[in-house]
Amino acid sequence: MTVVELSPFSMLVPLIASAVCALLPGRLWPWLLTFAAAAASAVIAAITLAAAMDGPLSYAFGNWEPPIGIEYRIDAANAFVALLVSAVAAVILPWAKTSVDQEVPERQGPFYALFLLAFAGLMGITLTGDAFNVFVFLEISSLATYALIAHGQDRRALLAAFRYLIMGTVGATFLLIGIGFLYMMTGTLNMVDLAQRLPELRDTATVEVALAFIVVGMGL
């Protein structure tokens, strides 16, 4: 397996582990699986970063070549961010275990499954080279985060999760509208392709509105 073929597994490992984690009983096994998945993702991200220092890596899902297919395009910058995200996830888990035991005293599998989903979403946002997939991974991460907030024993946790859901939904809608406008103007969702086509359209009102929607959506 080449580094290019290995690179998507920094997102796929926590995504697959989340499905398994939801079924695990007790406290220890879900935590161990979550820590192992985060550590494995960090190792893969480190290997990817080392390879990306020599030039961008491109992985086309389903052998559909970009810009038609979905592309993972990894350069040194986003590979470093992926390593940072995965390393932080792995480092905080041992320290967070005591707090999780207090907040979720019973079966912790679903809690750690949601954590892994949120983590996988963040990794997907970092690595994808497709604008619509940024939206998809953002929604995966956001929905998992809403559920994590609602896990708190304090009754205010549900209200906080609901407020977060409303704000997140509005923000995601703005983001999707902005991406839709960009697609309407350029005919592509591939970020490299967008970067090549947008300079010719930068003074058009539609592109300016699209960027405004994206900025507001990400801000919310």
Model regions: which residues?
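Alpha-helical transmembrane segments of integral membrane proteins, especially early/N-terminal helices
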Residues: 36-50, 132-136, 169-181
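Short hydrophobic "helix-edge" motifs at membrane interfaces and signal-peptide entry regions
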Residues: 3-5, 16, 64-66, 119-121, ...
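Hydrophobic residues within membrane-embedded alpha-helical segments of Major Facilitator Superfamily
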Residues: 10-13, 17-20, 81, 88, ...
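Transmembrane helix-loop-helix hairpins at membrane boundaries of multipass inner-membrane proteins
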Residues: 1-8, 16-113, 192-196
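Transmembrane helix-loop junction
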Residues: 22, 50-51, 150-151, 184-185
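Juxtamembrane/interfacial segments at transmembrane-helix boundaries in multi-pass membrane proteins
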Residues: 51-69, 140, 174-220
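Juxtamembrane helix-boundary/capping and inter-helix hinge elements in multi-pass membrane proteins
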Residues: 26-27, 151-158, 186-189
